[in-house]
Amino acid sequence: MTSSRQQQDIGAWIIVGFCFLALAVSFSARSSLSLIMEPMEKELGWSRTTTSAAASLAQIFMAAAAPIVGNMVDRFGARFLLSSGLAAVGGGVVLAAGAHTSWQFYLSYSVIAGIGFGTAATHVVSTVVSLNFTARRGLAVGIATAGATGGQLVVIPILARVLEHTDWRTSYVAIGISALALAPVVFLLIRPRAADIAARQERRADSAPMSERLSFLLRSPTFHLLFWSYFICGITTSGVIEAHLIPYSVFCGFPVATSSDAFGLLMAFNLGGMVLAGWLSDRMNRPLLLGAIYILRGLSFIILMFIAGDPALLVTFAVMFGVFDYSTVPVTASLAASHLGLKIMGLTMGMLTAGHALGAAVGAQMGGVLFDLLATYQWTWIVALITALLAGVLCFAIRENRERGWLVPATA
């Protein structure tokens, strides 16, 4: 291997590392809402529906931002987008810490930070990493996007301990400052290679209008299978689990610290599951792999229904669900690259992420409304089980086709 090639490889892995960190901070800020729900509701007198609406509204703004951001990645690269997304996350979360009314919290967390969540996001990271790798692409995407869980593995259990000694507002300020501090670091250290700049300029010059590229996607059966399975992915992960697992665990009688430890354990296995799924996506039939992930995730909800009073079952669920949580991301990104083309990878992943966010909005709000109406989460888990099984069936309908060689569609 030549010195120049070694430097290129090192540069590509540096991008992977800082993409990991960006997702770690962004996703930790997003998921921390589930941890502060109880103290925030007690202080402000809000219902579970009101606090769940903040998560749901944030997902809607993520959905609105995702395709636009994805299109911008294709044309301008990820450096500015990741750093500005982190700045929006940090600023929004700091403002949310000072909220005293629901509209103030919605504006700061759901709108400002929500747009940041949709910008410093897995679809941006998976796109920039895919464009920097040919060999070991699935592994690289798996490692980079594992930041979405890696940060939560560390931050959420620590935050739970901090909440034992201070209020939720102080904790939120600390998270926001972390995001603001990382934003300029990402901008300075994720430097595009000369070849990447030239390729981006070529894509910009050759790029068809966004409407034409969207038309190509909407005519593709593969896109619809990926989109609707990813919509369900949002319901069953960011929707019901990210927003409601810790409150549900506390409702079942577990202390907040124990509940957050279980969430941290889930994220530990989540991280490993993402890397493993990325590695497997380079080696086996990807539609079968993706479908199996959804089905096994769905079956884990059966365990969740019976955790009350049984710490062993809580741990068992955390391990099983963790392995099959975000492990859909690298496999979905790999299929998007091979079946829909690298030239519109950003737009494709943006559209898929929009679907995921809309599903998460449905799941988060559904959990809050059903809990307020029925004083139980059981129907939430039943819906999650059924929809996850449906997502698996959708993925089995996708044809494996590696031989297309990451082709770019003619309309792009």
Predicted regions and their residues:
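Conserved MFS/SLC helix-loop-helix module at the cytosolic interface between two early adjacent transmembrane helices
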Residues: A64-S102, S281, P287
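Helix-loop-helix hairpin linking two adjacent transmembrane segments in secondary transporters
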Residues: A148-A195
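Intracellular juxtamembrane helix-capping segments at the cytosolic ends
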Residues: M40, T119-F133, S327-L340
